Amino acid sequence: MKPISIIGVPMDLGQTRRGVDMGPSAMRYAGVIERLERLHYDIEDLGDIPIGKAERLHEQGDSRLRNLKAVAEANEKLAAAVDQVVQRGRFPLVLGGDHSIAIGTLAGVAKHYERLGVIWYDAHGDVNTAETSPSGNIHGMPLAASLGFGHPALTQIGGYSPKIKPEHVVLIGVRSLDEGEKKFIREKGIKIYTMHEVDRLGMTRVMEETIAYLKERTDGVHLSLDLDGLDPSDAPGVGTPVIGGLTYRESHLAMEMLAEAQIITSAEFVEVNPILDERNKTASVAVALMGSLFGEKLM
């Protein structure tokens, strides 16, 4: 059992809705530390990465990317913190914050692996670039940036690019893609299980295939779990909810199967927004899923 280091990233600059910066606090309040300590893990909480201020329009220069400078700076700090955690032989567990923070997490983790795999558990593909993004929100770009596509301020975080390869990525739970993203996923040959596949195959088979696929090709796997991957009835407190999502039960099963397979080497849970939530339900769901990921069982 690897010791776990928790890093909070109160980032809300990768999108426009207020409140997601309170996600790390909400998950701590929902008892993440106590839950993992009950499973006999050695836990340290490294506190939060400092986040700069939102940029005014005139400060953005010619960039279509909202808050590019502040997002890049925070991700550089996060990459350095995660790098340190991995160097110390600990498991980095990152609490978001919007999904733009995955750029920093992956930058810190990937340098320690030859072939890092990624499970992207999300309603969205997050493979936009400045050219394809309808919004200019960086939380829709972290996977593209980590694959080496997009603005150099994002792709070069941690001082190297790319962090990961398309054939080492599996997308699960996707049900909302922009046109440019569909083209990107097809062209790069990224393995994807949309909700259509999840419904047809069932979650057990999706996870069995995902685990077998990554075990064969990678030497470590990062889990990037966006709470909007779940259906809004189970996880209402997210900034970009999409109906028809993964259930709590399916997600719980997915985490249990990952725990049994023992392939996950780092993880982040993102997009918990307490302002949009109902009585901290979404943060509690996130913490319950972390419990399952780290081996919590009913019996």
From Swiss-Prot:
The reaction(s) annotated as catalysed by this protein in its Swiss-Prot or TrEMBL entry are: L-arginine + H2O = urea + L-ornithine
Does the keyword field hold Metal-binding?
yes
Tell me its cofactors: Mn(2+)
Its Gene Ontology molecular function terms?
arginase activity; manganese ion binding
Which annotated residues bind Mn(2+) 1? H99, D122, D126, D226
Cofactor: how and how many bound: Binds 2 manganese ions per subunit.
Uppermost EC category: hydrolase
* GO BP term, example: urea cycle
Kindly tell me the pathway this chain contributes to: Nitrogen metabolism; urea cycle; L-ornithine and urea from L-arginine: step 1/1
Q: Which family does it belong to?
A: Belongs to the arginase family.
What's the protein called, per UniProt? Arginase
Q: Which organism is it from?
A: Bacillus caldovelox
The gene for this chain is: rocF
